[in-house]
Curated annotation (Swiss-Prot):
Protein name: Zinc finger protein 561
Subcellular location: Nucleus
Source species, domain of life: Eukaryota
InterPro entries reported in the protein's UniProt record: KRAB, KRAB_dom_sf, Zinc_finger, Znf_C2H2_sf, Znf_C2H2_type
Keyword Repeat: yes
Length: 486
């Protein structure tokens, strides 16, 4: 089958006034194709016809599939047997649908089952869609014709006095100008493929039908979020409820097993996976699985070494933005998580969770070697290394090894002499933020660690631990040579 040479679709530097009846564009396309290729098949030879009743039964997706197939056929035909006469005389309803697609640049969605024909009272042209007629009427109403701008956002017209070889058509969204309408039709199809769902009121295009559905609320029965600081226009009631839930903290979705609440269904669905143990996102490097794609993406950065989130205070980089946020608090001193029992504040929620166990006395992680219990699993893992003698973290400067990476990081600062944490009261500098916090208590007199037996208070938790051994009689340090415990 012969194909159409569309190399004539060149761009022009000068703006073009694109207003004229679409019938002239149709005539030019037909004449050009008919004169260029005499022995090719016609549009009617490849067209698939539906009766009005059959067409009404198609949903929006099926109509767009029909459009895509017929447009592809149209672009590959050497001639098109479209008679330039009012569309009301045509027997094929689909051809009217397709022609409006090509020559108006507007994608149509039918909200009714019947096929209603609308005619222009000024020139008599007939349209198969009311909004196509509205778009056409703007040409009669003098829509900015002297300035060379398109009326609407996705409207295609041709110049009144144009002929083949001149600048004919301009598509407003991208500003490209073509010398012949078929070239513009191909260009339109490329752009429309990216945003196939068009608003019939303003012509705005959307990639997804749901986005168009939300947008239509601006023109019709929009529901404004009741919170003034939000000022969002939300159409579906479910979206409005979800927006309100964000402001009020109300969580309407609940799990049946534990009763935990969420603001929307997607959060609920993700949470249910934690109960089922589903981990459908697998790392191709190490085989580790994760519950969601975001966790997998964070994990992949461990293999790549990419740390895109950098601290503006010290230059330290992190793989996740949440890690950077928590780190910045070590510089700013912000501690948003406060213990309701003793008032101690923490920069991270995990720190507060661990601290709360000190009040409850809960230590769920127990060492199988010696029976010692810990509040966190990481503390248990680090403790087990005492029994195994494992010290996997080595200092590159002196070769000294450590049980944990945090201890190695602290040790490295002894080589660099860095003391980034400075007391604002006396100017004394410290290697670690924890030591600065302890030092600050010498100025404030704060002693948050209290002995439950005698009520004596301490500024440091380690001093409280030593003091408690007086009451318990515990002597954990044993001299192996003399068999003496201290």
């Amino acid at each position: 089958m012969a194909t159409i040479d569309l190399s004539h679709g060149f761009f022009s530097r000068e703006p073009v006034c694109p207003f004229e009846e679409k019938t002239k564009a149709e005539r030019m396309v037909e004449d050009y194709l008919a004169n260029s290729y005499q022995d090719s098949v016609t549009f009617d030879d490849v067209a698939v016809d539906f009766t009005p009743e059959e067409w009404a039964l198609l949903d929006t997706t099926e109509k767009y599939l029909y459009r895509d197939v017929m447009l592809e056929n149209y672009m590959n035909l050497a001639s098109v047997e479209w008679e330039i006469q009012p569309r009301i005389k045509r027997s094929s309803f689909q051809q009217g649908f397709l022609k409006n697609q090509i020559f108006s640049g507007i994608q149509m969605t039918r909200g009714y089952s019947g096929w209603k024909l609308c005619d222009c009272k000024n020139c008599g042209e007939v349209f198969s869609e009311q909004f196509c007629l509205k778009t056409h009427m703007r040409a009669h109403n003098g829509g900015n014709t002297s300035e060379g701008n398109c009326y609407g956002k996705d409207v295609l017209s041709v110049h009144k006095e144009a002929s083949i070889g001149q600048e004919l058509s301009k598509f407003n969204p991208c500003g490209k100008v073509f010398t012949l309408t078929p070239g513009l039709a191909v260009h339109l199809e490329v752009l429309n493929a990216r945003q196939p769902y068009k608003c019939k009121e303003c012509g705005k295009g959307f990639k997804y039908f749901a986005s168009l559905d939300n947008h239509m609320g601006i023109h019709t029965d929009e529901k404004l979020c009741e919170f003034q600081e939000c000022e969002r226009a939300i159409t579906p009631s479910s979206h409005l409820k979800q927006c309100v839930a964000v402001h009020t903290g109300k969580k309407s979705k609940k799990t049946k097993k534990y009763g935990k609440s969420f603001t929307n269904f997607s959060q609920l669905y993700a949470h249910v996976k934690t109960h089922k143990g589903e981990k459908s996102f697998e790392c191709k490097e190490c085989g580790r699985s994760f519950r969601n794609s975001s966790c997998l993406n964070d994990h992949i950065q461990i293999h790549t070494g990419i740390k895109p989130h950098k601290c503006t205070y010290c230059g330290k980089a992190f793989t996740r933005s949440t890690q950077l946020t928590e780190h910045v608090r070590t510089h700013t001193g912000i501690k948003p998580y406060e213990c309701k029992e003793c008032g101690q504040a923490f920069a991270q929620y995990s720190g507060l969770s661990i601290h709360i166990r000190s009040h409850s006395g809960k230590k769920p992680y127990q060492c199988k070697e010696c029976g010692k219990a810990f509040t966190t699993s990481t503390s248990l893992i680090q403790h087990i290394r005492i029994h195994t003698g494992e010290k996997p973290y080595e200092c590159v400067e002196c070769g000294k090894t450590f049980i944990t990476s945090s201890r190695r990081s602290k040790h490295l600062k002894t080589h660099s002499g860095e003391k980034p944490f400075v007391c604002k009261i006396c100017g004394k500098a410290f290697l670690y933020s924890s030591r600065l916090n302890v030092h600050l208590r010498t100025h404030t007199g704060e002693k948050p660690f209290v002995c439950k037996e005698c009520g004596k208070a301490f500024a440091v938790s380690s001093r409280l631990s030593r003091h408690e051994r007086i009451h318990t009689g515990e002597k954990p340090h044993e001299c192996k040579s003399m068999s003496v415990t201290i």
